[in-house]
C-alpha cells in the first residue's frame, strides 16, 4: 500500500502541476479515532494544512470535513473529488460535489450521500481530495487524504457507526412526560422516552444537570395537587436513578398549576397541564 501510494503521488504531479499540494507524508500518516455511542470520528492530520475528518454525531448526518489552520479560502468554490488509484490504470478524477466558499473560510464540509461515497472510495483505495483558491497562494491548492494505515482503523469506525445512537442531544434536551388525571404512574411510551434519556446521559460525560419540574392542572385542592406534582417529578427521578443516572445530576422542582401550558378552562387544556418537564444541560 505504501509503495502504491507513493507511486500515485508521483504520477499525479504532471496532472496537478498548477495546484499546490498538501498531503500526509507517506511515512508519517496517522489516523485518530473517536469511538463512543454519541460520536464516531476518523480524522487524519495533514501537515501544513490542518485535518480531514470523516464523522457522525448521534442524530446527525454522516460527514466529511476538511479544516485548515493555514489556508483560508478566497470567495469562490471548493470541489470535492475522488482520484483513482494507480493500480486501476486510470488518471481520471470523479467529482463528488462543488460548493460555494466565503472569503476567509477555513472549514469545508459535505454530508450525507456524498460524504458516504467518499468513505466508500477511500476504502477501495481511491483518494478523497479538495481543490480551492487560498488567500495565501497564487494558484489553486489541492488537499489529499492518504489511505496508508486506513485498514487498521476503518473496521472499528464502521462498528462505531452501526452502534451510534439514532437520536440527537437536541431531541432529548427538552422532554415532556404526560400523566393522566390525578395519576402519577408512567405509561409504556413515557418509559421508552425516559430510556432514551438514560442511554444518552450514560454516553455523554458533558451532561452536568437534569432539571425536573412537576406540574398539575387546577383540578382539585391545592394540598392534593402539591402531593401530585411532587409525586410526578419523583417518579421520573426514581426511574432515571433506577436505570443508572446519578442522583447528583438531578434537580427537582414542583410548580403545581402555576405555569400552565394551555388554558385550564377546557378538558384538553387541563390534560396538557399535568406533565413533568425535563431539561438537560451540558
Which residues does each predicted region cover?
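An ectodomain-focused feature that recognizes extracytoplasmic/extracellular
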Residues: 20-77
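Extended low-complexity, serine/threonine- and proline-enriched intrinsically disordered segments
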Residues: 65-97
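Short, solvent-exposed, Trp/other aromatic-anchored flexible loops in extracytoplasmic proteins
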Residues: 105-123
Amino acid at each position: 500500500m505504501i509503495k502504491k501510494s507513493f507511486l500515485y503521488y508521483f504520477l499525479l504531479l504532471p496532472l496537478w502541476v498548477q495546484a499546490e499540494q498538501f498531503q500526509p507524508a507517506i511515512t508519517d500518516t496517522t489516523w485518530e479515532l473517536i469511538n463512543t455511542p454519541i460520536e464516531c470520528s476518523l480524522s487524519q492530520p495533514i501537515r501544513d494544512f490542518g485535518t480531514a475528518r470523516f464523522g457522525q454525531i448521534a442524530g446527525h448526518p454522516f460527514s466529511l470535513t476538511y479544516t485548515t489552520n493555514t489556508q483560508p479560502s478566497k470567495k469562490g468554490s471548493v470541489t470535492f473529488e475522488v482520484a483513482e488509484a494507480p493500480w486501476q490504470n486510470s488518471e481520471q478524477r470523479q467529482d463528488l460535489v462543488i460548493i460555494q466558499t466565503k472569503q476567509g473560510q477555513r472549514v469545508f464540509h459535505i454530508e450525507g450521500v456524498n460524504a458516504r461515497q467518499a468513505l466508500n472510495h477511500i476504502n477501495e483505495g481511491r483518494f478523497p481530495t479538495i481543490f480551492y483558491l487560498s488567500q495565501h497562494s497564487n494558484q489553486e491548492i489541492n488537499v489529499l487524504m492518504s489511505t496508508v494505515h486506513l485498514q487498521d482503523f476503518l473496521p472499528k469506525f464502521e462498528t462505531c457507526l452501526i452502534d451510534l445512537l439514532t437520536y440527537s442531544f437536541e431531541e432529548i434536551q427538552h422532554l415532556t412526560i404526560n400523566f393522566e388525571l390525578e395519576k402519577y404512574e408512567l405509561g409504556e411510551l413515557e418509559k421508552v422516552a425516559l430510556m432514551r434519556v438514560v442511554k444518552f446521559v450514560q454516553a455523554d460525560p458533558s451532561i452536568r444537570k437534569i432539571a425536573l419540574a412537576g406540574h398539575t392542572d387546577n383540578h382539585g385542592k391545592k394540598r392534593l395537587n402539591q402531593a401530585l406534582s411532587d409525586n410526578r417529578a419523583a417518579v421520573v427521578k426514581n426511574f432515571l436513578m433506577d436505570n443508572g443516572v446519578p442522583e447528583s445530576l438531578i434537580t427537582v422542582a414542583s410548580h403545581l398549576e402555576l405555569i400552565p401550558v394551555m388554558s385550564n378552562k377546557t378538558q384538553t387544556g387541563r390534560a396538557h397541564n399535568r406533565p413533568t418537564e425535563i431539561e438537560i444541560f451540558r
